[in-house]
Amino acid sequence: MVKALAPRIAAVVVGGVLLHLAFPPRTVWWTAIVAFALLWWALSGVRVRRAAWLGAVFGFAFYLAHLMWIQDFLGRDYGPFPWVGLSLVMAGFPALGGALVALAARLPAAPVWGALAFAAQEWLQSRFPLNGFPWGRVAFGQVEGPFLPLAAIGGAPLVSVAVVAAGFCVAAFLQRPRRVVGLVPVVAIVLVLLAVPTPPVDAQDGTRTVAVVQGNAPDIGLGLFSAGRTLRANSLAETSVLADRVRSGAVARPDLVVWPESSLSTDGVDPAVDRAVDALGVPFLIGANYEAGATDTENAVVVWNPGTGAGERYAKQELVPFGERIPLRAVTQYLTPFVALADFTPGTAPGVLPVAGTRVATAICYETAYDHVLRDGVADGGSLLVIPTNNAWYGRGEMTWQHLAMSRLRAVEHGRAAVVAALSGASAVIRPDGSVVARTGLYTADTLVEQVPLRTELTFATRWGAWFEHGLALAGLLAAAAGYLLRRRELSRTSTGA
């Protein structure tokens, strides 16, 4: 059986790797289309169980390449088990996708229904298990391509469906090139992409000058456990440099200063931070491990005002599994170095904070992968996205660029400028159309000072994105169910001789 399947296995392995190559730091977004063309060819004409197996191989090849940064992070102390283990678990979702595609492929316009069916597994991936792990969604690899403007209509789910559909349609046409009707979905996708307007970047509620302080962190992996004082000192030092540049007139005085995630640990009292804020005379948004009580610590963004100190804060809602919350500690002690730490307390309020005369929507690092966090903040009045992150744990691998791509997609999805403040890079300022105004390098102290537009108009994705996501997933599942029923009917007719 394996010998007979060898060409299909080779196709899905190559397809999984090509899907990974579509993601930043590379700009070859089109390899995702080739990846899904190969997947469609491999799944054509196979039974559901075999399609699930091929989908799993496709997914394992993708995640093994895409999550290599986990090996860079933990490999020295834990070997390949966390990296390979997570890749195997995540491969279960494309396995489900492959099975659903095999069912939906029995319908007319099969490539389109198949794309909806495959994308339905991303809906599940964002929710299960342990509240999901939505890393590596197809849409996040499209920030350099023509599909990106679709995010303003249907968010990441629509972008994913469009890319998968493009690959499936191309493969279906190549399988039967004499059937002109096979070109119809391809032409339709092209026309839709041409019709979608470029996201506007103009200000609707004035502008703000924002300073992003990247204090830097040592590239020491797990040694960061004991580097808290260094991170705080580095942020204070780079802020002092910023204050000197403002006083000398080298840069404009910002309206808002942003510090990255985990810049300090605090209970809201820190005289040195007070002095730094007072020296510039403008409010700060500071990423901090915030001691909210005797046993409660939040991963938070704190508004720090001149003269009055720490004020309102937002607590991270979507905590990193096995990092900020540890399930099954007796087992996971062999997979994560964070097992000795107490779980962070998750927040429950939307990520929106009043600061610098406006309302800022915020998500902290990993949360950017979830659709609802920034959507809720923007719907609650956020006119600017601020995304503090700490990528210092993961070295110089691709994790930083994968996360930055998510932030770029969210800017387009909500029609907002985005400010990414990273502890060790890459920090960035992003326009509402997803283009990068400025960014820093990795493992260097630096500060960005840029003027950003404030926008108030809500995109279709912000207003209706949740319903759109559920609708796409439901359509995919219904297509698979219809294909299953159609197959049952055909078998019934065959068995009765009808």
What are these regions (language model features)?
Residues 23-38, 56, 62-67, 214-215, ...:
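Short, conserved active-site loops that position catalytic residues or coordinate cofactors/metal ions
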Residues 72-81, 117, 126-154, 298-371, ...:
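Active-site catalytic loop in hydrolytic enzyme cores
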Residues 90, 115, 256, 264-286, ...:
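CN hydrolase (nitrilase-like) catalytic-core segments centered on the catalytic cysteine
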Residues 196-322, 352-356, 362, 366-368, ...:
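Soluble catalytic regions of membrane-associated enzymes that act on cell-envelope
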Residues 492-498:
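Cytoplasmic C-terminal tails of single-pass
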Residues 13, 92, 162, 227-234, ...:
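Soluble or luminal CAZymes and related metallo-dependent hydrolases
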